[in-house]
Every structure is written in C-alpha cells, then in structure tokens.
Amino acid sequence: MKTLITLTLAILLCCSVANAQEHKQEPKQAETPQSKLVQFQMALLRRGPKWSPDPSRERAQMRQRHVAHLRSMLESNKLMIAGAISGDPELIEVHIFRTKSAEEATAWLNEDPAVSAGFIVPELHPWWSEDVMKKMSGPPGRFTTAYLAFLTRGDKWTPEKTPATEDIQKGHMANIQRLAEMKKLVVAGPFGDDGKLRGIFVFKVNSIDEARQLAATDPAVQSGRLALQIHPWTVPEGILP
C-alpha cells in the first residue's frame, strides 16, 4: 500500500511540474504532492573523453577505485542507489543521491576517481520520490537486475491541459496503480527541471520484454504524450522496495 501511495503521489507531482509554467496561478496543485515527497538528485553518467572500451591496467585500476568510492558513498547513506546501465551506447550508470542540493551532489560526484579523471561525465537532475529505498546492508558483490524506464516527452506531448489530456492522465494514473498492485512497478517519480526527461519507472520483473509490455499499457505512452527508453539496471541487492 505504501508503494501504491508513493507512485500515485509521484505522478501527481509529475503533473504539477509539467504544468508549473502554464499554471502558476494554481499553487496548491504543486504544493500538495511536494509536501509528501522528497527531492533527491539523480546523476546520469555518460562516457567521458578518457573512456575506452579497450581493457588496460589503468582502466582496471580506475574501475576498482570507482567501485570502492561508490560502496563508501552507499555505506555513508549519501548515495541512495547506484547501478550500471546496459544497452545504451553512451549512458553507463545511474546514481541517486540523498540530497536536494545540486551543489552537494556535484561535490560528491567530483570525489569519484572516474569522474575527476574524465572517464565518465555526470548529468545531474532534480528528482522527486517518497523515501522508500532501503540502506544497503547486504554483502559486497551481490546484485540484481531491475529495469529502469525513462519517461520522455513524446511526439504528441503538449503543455496545455484539455479534457482529452485529463482523460489520458486519469488512465495513466489508473494504470500505475494497477502495475503497483501487481508488485511489478516498485519506484516512480518525476524530474523537477521541466525538460525532455519527465520521470522514471523502475520495474522488478524477469525480463526487459516484460518491462516493455507493462510500460506499453500506459495510456500516456499509447497516446504519444510520453515515450519510453527502458534499460537493464544492475543494482545492489536489498535496496529497491
């Protein structure tokens, strides 16, 4: 039930963020979900100028230092979750920091040996969700694969609110509730910077095909208002709800 409430509130906030510029005269729409959710910072880490796919001693040593740094950040609870992305030519990892401050998250990112050396380059976004992820407590080296879906503006996306978009939104939320009740969709939340990226879904399912099939049932996706990019996301066991 808590997960269901979390997902519902997250989508309510997603609506308020998307319409913030067009509906500033309606502050309650933004304030109510924000009072229930927590702001974090999400870093999308892409290949940097020093990145290379070729194996080398330098790359192996950098990888070890990078992983050690991530574990230290997870243990200190500064980093809520971090994992490797598969199937994208540029995006390598996604990290979520337990802070609403972009400056603080940037400072933590710059402490990462792989970032400071130019192997990876972070792209930071404010992100909202209820605080449902658990502090890492399992032994090192145990991972699980979830499926991370980025919701982006689709070809039919518009900022205007109309009866048609309201109907789509109602169907969108009903579908999220259905997926949450199935215990397939475990985390959802909107980005707060009103850009092309609108939010994320995290699926705990057996395959990317199943994640795609579930995501495709969303009326906002079917209508073209939202589009999806889904990737395997390898994260430490025991953190996702």
Segment roles from a protein language model:
Residues 6-16:
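Bacterial N-terminal signal peptides
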Residues 21-241:
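Conserved, structured core segments of small domains
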Residues 1-6, 21:
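Positively charged n-region of N-terminal signal peptides that target proteins for export
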